[in-house]
Amino acid sequence: MNQELSTNPFNPVAPVKTFDEIKISLASPERILSWSYGEIKKPETINYRTFKPERDGLFCARIFGPIKDYECLCGKYKRMKYRGVVCEKCGVEVTLQKVRRERMGHIELAAPVAHIWFLKSLPSRIGLMLDMTLRDLERILYFENYVVIEPGLTDLTYGQLMTEEEFLDAQDQYGADAFTANIGAEAIREMLSAIDLEQTAETLREELKEATGELKPKKIIKRLKIVESFLESGNRPEWMILTVLPVIPPELRPLVPLDGGRFATSDLNDLYRRVINRNNRLKRLIELRAPDIIVRNEKRMLQEAVDALFDNGRRGRVITGTNKRPLKSLSDMLKGKQGRFRQNLLGKRVDFSGRSVIVTGPELKLHQCGLPKKMALELFKPFIYSRLEAKGLSSTVKQAKKLVEKERPEVWDILDEVIREHPVLLNRAPTLHRLGIQAFEPILIEGKAIQLHPLVCSAFNADFDGDQMAVHVPLSLEAQLEARVLMMSTNNVLSPANGAPIIVPSQDMVLGLYYTTMERRGMKGEGMAFSSVEEVEHALAAGEVHLHATITARIKQIDEEGNEVVKRYQTTPGRLRLGNLLPLNAKAPFELVNRLLRKKDVQNVIDTVYRYCGQKESVIFCDQIMGMGFREAFKAGISFGKDDMLIPDTKWPIVNEVRDQVKEFEQQYMDGLITQGEKYNKVVDAWSKCSDKVAGEMMAEISAVRYDDAGAEKEPNSVYMMSHSGARGSPAQMKQLGGMRGLMAKPNGEIIETPIISNFKEGLTVLEYFNSTHGARKGLADTALKTANSGYLTRRLVDVAQDCIVRTHDCGTENAITASAAVNEGEVVSPLAERVLGRVAAEDILVPGSDEVIVARGELIDERRADLVDQANVASVRIRSPLTCEAEEGVCAMCYGRDLARGTLVNIGEAVGIIAAQSIGEPGTQLTMRTFHIGGIAQGGQQSFLEASQEGRIEFRNPNLLENANGEQIVMGRNMQLAIIDEAGQERATHKLTYGAKVHVKDGQTVKRATRLFEWDPYTLPIIAEKAGVARFVDLVSGISVREDTDEATGMTQKIVSDWRSTPKGGDLKPEIIIMNPETGDPMRNEAGNPISYPMSVEAILSVEDGQTVRAGDVVARIPREGARTKDITGGLPRVAELFEARRPKDHAIIAENDGYVRFGKDYKNKRRITIEPVDDTLNSVEYMVPKGKHIPVQEGDFVQKGDYIMDGNPAPHDILRILGVEALANYMIDEVQEVYRLQGVKINDKHIEVIVRQMLQKYEILDSGETTLLKGEHVDKAELDEVNQKAMDHGMRPAHAEPILLGITKASLQTRSFISAASFQETTRVLTEASVQGKRDKLVGLKENVIVGRLIPAGTGGATSRVKKIAHDRDQKVIDTRRAEAESAAALAAPTDEVIDLGSEDSGLVETVENREE
């Protein structure tokens, strides 16, 4: 807990100052003077001839201390024995030169000056205190207007502004003494010091009770907050105006002589000099009684000089130095990436480090790295010196140095000793996740490059094309221990992001293993039988059997009981070799490798070995298969030439067929049968299908099995082997080499209609080449942007989650979330077993339909239990989650579940927040940057139908169907679902049916897999007539609300609803189509008895004419999907950022807040009013305003359920939280984020997203303050809220009422309780201004604060030590308290009086000296 500030140089044995928290507040003039060692009167710095500091200047030795250790300026006193003497000649105290880093000075200002932070940092604190606008304040401060401070008996008002003329007139009118008005900072200072804070707070509270309206209470609350914070912190408002200016120690703004008699100086000296010059001039002018106007001008200049010193450029012109460069002010020293916080406090350069290029080291073990001798010698120098001395080879450091410089042979022997079992850390920038720094044991090598083990490359994301890596030496024993136990590469087999092995073979190794495990027909030695592995090896060496021949052989295995048995397998020599490397374990049988191994399979094998055979075995196994992979790939001699790229013969027939199709589409377009947009979509569709087809043909050709004349199977195509094994190259790349390149996208994401038909083997035509430059250039630009964006996202995530640490074992909460399989478009993308793995069950999990418990409550679900859950067909499981954890600080281990990188329950002290942030941010660079627009996806066609993914029985939910004239079933409802139920009655899939879809199956029908269930129009959203009748147009006026589009190419016209609000006459129109009864001429009515009318939205295409007869199920109008677009797919990184920043989408969906019936109210000018009348009478009806012309999918009288969309679009996460609660929000966030990553094939565990969402939900917004001190609309932490409410309840007062709110990650980081952490993140000046006004205390609980003040972080081993210290401290405290109580009771007995006796009762504290075990 306790931290040394610095050792006292004068008294090293004095106890060091310790602290537990840091407080920031305003400094009063007295406080500034108490820091100061003297006033600085002159702007001079140092004498240019003698280089000695000038007296009373900015570097004055008398004020700040001596230049040399223990030596005064004139040289009269030298050496230690005069320590503490003040020289009578030059006035310098004889002491350490170091005091020049800590002694401060001050400048007495001739006129008060406003502190720019409190003036200009919005909202202006001075302005809020005085209830004045910033503009008025500046007018007073910069001497444009007078302000009335004391109106007296005149009819002026307090705080009124007057110009010079008005002021003089008023003086003439009322007399000079009748009222007080003033100008400049003095006036503001007088007003601030006159404020009675308690009185003001009272008045404001009274006003707040009576205030009505929207803005007034907000304004009052703002002022009340600041008044209260001044009251609580003990600051005075007038301290925001400076009368004394502190001067920072000279060593912190150094003046350095350069060669050639010039000086380099810190900008601060320039800024201070300007202030001193102007201040001195002002003093002189006041003494000389100069005219007012001159003095004022000088005061204004002084104010500007001080402003520039504190925050240059915040107000007025930026003050520049000699070379037109803006001067760096005090604020700039703190701000930004180059500021104090991020440059020097959060990251520092360290010694004992080096960097060099990396090369591969395939003969290393997994825990080793090759370190060049020269580097090791330099890095381990002090260790070598001490060993040399210990061995008696050198008596002094100087001698040792000489030996090392000469590189004598004994030095190398000693280096070997020193380096033995001393791990070093290797780091590759960018360190995107914790696996970017790992520990290895160094092996000395010749040469100058670091050797890296090939298996750890994927963790470092390293390759050997010139990458560099840095080496760091952990010095202390503790550091070495942590490096070995926590950071050793052998201890980091699993990835913390998803729990899968990250130490996996890649490239050559995969290819080698693939080749080894191949099986080919008709090879030499096929059908032979062998008795043991050794015999097979023998036969291979003798050339009697081929690596790929099918043979029968015996191999040792372990059965279920754990006995060694010998089993026979049909296999190949290659697979047998691999099986021989497997650790003997019942759970890792030979079947594991008795198959063709691709990259995924190899990862699976490693995972299985790690889970069941332990870490040591798996590390040895990894090393062995790496060696084998390299060896076999080398022996196989796989390589390819241009002839291995096959172009299928069927390519041109396919292409020509599609060309004809495209011609046909063009013709249809010319004839006006389809619109240009439809033509574009169809053409793009056709070409993308063609390109896929050609690729398919090519893959079929290239993967075909071929035989030689003897009937033996030939080796497969080399390119195919590389791609199929997962070593290098993807089908997409092969398609470009041997198929056709396909469609290209323009830089804005649109797709060019003409595809590139050639492939790289044939070569591109000039035109095709030109078309392809688009994509290539965009790719490069994207990559550069992506890296920066991804890094910034990671930084924000880390900042919001940095104080989320596992603090307790179990918080005992009853809350939980429900996990079920993730289904996307009716396809299970992540099964339930995968989602609950490594979580703690919140309730007993039962076999459906029985009482058999699979997993008991509070048990960790491991692989075995997850399999049981899967086999039992459980639909959903209640699991503990960080979201619902109720731990006081951080989260508890039970809610978090398994530590993915270790495979066991998470340890207390694990920094799960940072791990979550890294896991989400690290794959960021793999995500795409672009926002897709529907109508341009280079991957091809729009899906327009859905097939059954499983067999089962169809069940309709909330059916609402209509049969049209052709006998087709059309969906008319908005919340109809279609479910597929299996034999056991378990729901296997549910699909939401869109309005206007055609359903091909009946309720209760049994379907096979791939039966077409329903289809819809992917390009437009239809509006369908419910009943037969005559269509009647209302307010569809040609030229105002309808435009006729004539297609130039085809001459066809379409009637399209245009935006009628933009026309002058169209303000009140409500364009709609009504279905009339042809007999009566009245509108037809629906079941609810309302007239059937269809309001038209902008851009709708009318499909009927006025007065045309329509049948039930006919399409009245079509809305293009672009207009009522299902959603604009923001893809990739921007989507993830949008979700975590909790931004409201542009056209966000409107969600029904409760169950009820839809009513359309009276319309506004260009908004429509929708009201929901709740079923439950106790609730109020809710109104929504929807812009006219937006498509509203609900009708008058429709019943909606809580959480239904009244308007389509992306839902705003805030609404989901408010209406449906935390769990629904969690599910939404997890699904949306996972969808983005899933598209890229990145696996991230859900719990990481939950941790981040938990951090976004920390704050509560006060809805009703009750009788507490909290204010309506204020954001407070849950802990704070509970504390205040508890206090209120104890006193019998009404508690405050609040609801959780969702903050975006940037907002949440800036609102954290620690001001140090917030200031080091963003908007440094604003955070510090706010914190100092409130007198905030930083309790140093998060990681960042502790790093900044230079302590161990309170996580991991640092957390353990601080916990032990706390226990010890508490125990000591108990003993002290008991002793004190004893002493007091003894004193009380000696002098018996009535009051004191009951102190003795506290004696019971003595018993509990053994610390509480829970700590």
Curated annotation (Swiss-Prot):
Protein residues bound to Zn(2+) 2: C811, C885, C892, C895
Gene that produces this protein: rpoC1
Superkingdom of origin: Bacteria
Catalytic reaction(s) noted: RNA(n) + a ribonucleoside 5'-triphosphate = RNA(n+1) + diphosphate
Protein name: DNA-directed RNA polymerase subunit beta'
Protein EC: 2.7.7.6
InterPro entries hit by this protein: DNA-dir_RpoC_beta_prime, DNA-dir_RpoC_beta_prime_bact, RNA_pol_asu, RNA_pol_N, RNA_pol_Rpb1_1, RNA_pol_Rpb1_3, RNA_pol_Rpb1_3_sf, RNA_pol_Rpb1_4
Native source species: Cereibacter sphaeroides (strain ATCC 17029 / ATH 2.4.9) (Rhodobacter sphaeroides)
Function: DNA-dependent RNA polymerase catalyzes the transcription of DNA into RNA using the four ribonucleoside triphosphates as substrates.
